[in-house]
């Protein structure tokens, strides 16, 4: 009887040891499996994180390039307007009208016309590449820049600054006197705007249409950031027209047209070289 009890106890002890060993083996396998699953989840999270990081880096690079393109277009259009509009026909129109009419009205009319012209020119510059390939538009812009640059340098070399300035002022005065008798246009729109505002707007708009600054604005907008070109050109027109209205003909007479033409010619030639050696992608 005692032997049977001992045998039974021994079997129970062996069963307990076997169960404990099996449990220990299961516990060792579970952490490994859990580790594998955790590693897989970690790998997936790492890949997702790396993908998001690369995407954010790409977005940051794109934003950086867009910012540089905006600044480049802004500076190019601003400098182009400053060197081409000072002493130009629109500059003299604003200066002469400000001598006889309220400066604020003349300034608002001239700036309104120039802003409208800038928007139209920038829009044309963005439409043209959709009709013509960027390669051809860039080539045309290069030729236009070179043409205007050489033309300005030729004007600076051949013209007498005082004589040419006096002649241009006389031509503008003749246009202003010729427009005094045409009151039908003023009467029609007098309910909406004052006659002085309309006169300043119409004369500035017609003088700017087809001018070298308008063509240069169109050329800039074909291969540079349109917003930067529009903002830079608008700021340049605002500065030049404000100087014309405040200073009048005194400011225009003190600025050497030969110097302005030389600076403008060199700037346009610089644009031409930049467009030729660094074409848009």
Swiss-Prot record:
GO biological process: Golgi calcium ion homeostasis; Golgi calcium ion transport
GO CC entries: Golgi apparatus; membrane
Keywords: Membrane, Signal, Transmembrane, Transmembrane helix
Entry's Gene Ontology molecular function annotations: calcium ion transmembrane transporter activity; manganese ion transmembrane transporter activity
Protein name per its UniProtKB record: GDT1-like protein 4
Transmembrane segments: 66-86, 105-125, 137-157, 188-208, 226-246, 258-278
Main location: membrane
Subcellular localization(s) per the UniProt record: Membrane
Membrane topology: Multi-pass membrane protein
InterPro entries, per the entry: GDT1-like (IPR001727)
A Pfam family: GDT1
Family named by the database record: Belongs to the GDT1 family.
Signal peptide stretch: 1-22
Organism this protein belongs to: Oryza sativa subsp. indica
Family matches, as PANTHER family: GDT1-LIKE PROTEIN 3, TRANSMEMBRANE PROTEIN HTP-1 RELATED
């Amino acid at each position: 009887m005692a032997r049977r009890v001992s045998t039974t106890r021994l079997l129970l002890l062996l069963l307990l040891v076997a169960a404990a060993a099996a449990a220990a083996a299961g516990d060792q396998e579970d952490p490994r499996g859990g580790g594998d699953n955790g590693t897989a989840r970690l790998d997936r999270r790492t890949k997702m994180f790396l993908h998001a990081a690369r995407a954010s880096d790409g977005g940051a690079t794109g934003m950086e390039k867009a910012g540089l393109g905006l600044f480049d277009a802004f500076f190019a259009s601003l400098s182009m307007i400053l060197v081409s509009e000072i002493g130009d026909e629109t500059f003299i129109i604003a200066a002469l009208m400000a001598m006889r009419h309220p400066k604020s009205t003349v300034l608002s009319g001239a700036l309104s016309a120039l802003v409208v012209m800038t928007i139209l020119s920038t829009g044309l510059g963005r439409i043209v590449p959709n009709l013509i390939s960027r390669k051809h538009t860039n080539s045309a812009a290069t030729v236009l820049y070179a043409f205007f640059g050489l033309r300005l340098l030729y004007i600076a070399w051949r013209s007498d600054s005082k004589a040419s300035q006096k002649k241009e002022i006389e031509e503008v005065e003749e246009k202003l006197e010729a427009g005094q008798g045409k009151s039908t246009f003023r009467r029609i729109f007098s309910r909406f705007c004052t006659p002085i505002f309309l006169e300043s707007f119409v004369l500035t708009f017609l003088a700017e249409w087809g001018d070298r600054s308008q063509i240069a604005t169109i050329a800039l907008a074909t291969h540079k950031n349109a917003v930067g070109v529009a903002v830079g050109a608008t700021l340049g027109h605002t500065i030049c027209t404000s100087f014309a209205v405040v200073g009048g003909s005194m400011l225009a007479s003190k600025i050497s047209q030969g110097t302005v033409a030389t600076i403008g010619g060199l700037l346009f030639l610089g644009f031409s070289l930049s467009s030729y050696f660094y074409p848009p992608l």
